[in-house]
Amino acid sequence: MMKVLVVVALLVTLISYSSSEGIGDLEADELLSLMANEQTRAKACTPRYYDCSHDRHSCCRSSMFKDVCTCFYPEGGDNKEVCTCQQPKHLKYMEKATDKIKNLFG
């Protein structure tokens, strides 16, 4: 019974707040114009197998998951760390399985 009263009180509060002047008087046209003027904030992503050492969170997304910036030391005596965007194997297998299931069911 107490849960019902809490939910009802919450709904009444939300409805009264949404109908009040607290939200503002933005009309649909004004809101659409604001959205049209909004600039894209996302910077260009780093493609798979390209260097991501400048920004380790800039890797692009695959069809389902975001690639991960993986750093390693290459063989050959050079102690310089190399970072590239790569897809983890478990995510690669999950994408392949999902694609096969989609192909089976249409």
UniProtKB/Swiss-Prot annotation:
Record has Kinase as a keyword: no
Record-linked PROSITE patterns: SPIDER_CSTX (PS60029)
Keyword Repeat found: no
Residues making up the propeptide: 21-41
Annotated keywords: Disulfide bond, Knottin, Secreted, Signal, Toxin
A Pfam family assignment: Toxin_35
Signal sequence region: 1-20
GO cellular component, one term: extracellular region
Family (UniProt): Belongs to the neurotoxin 19 (CSTX) family. 02 (D7) subfamily.
Domain free text: The presence of a 'disulfide through disulfide knot' structurally defines this protein as a knottin.
This protein's name: Toxin-like structure LSTX-D4
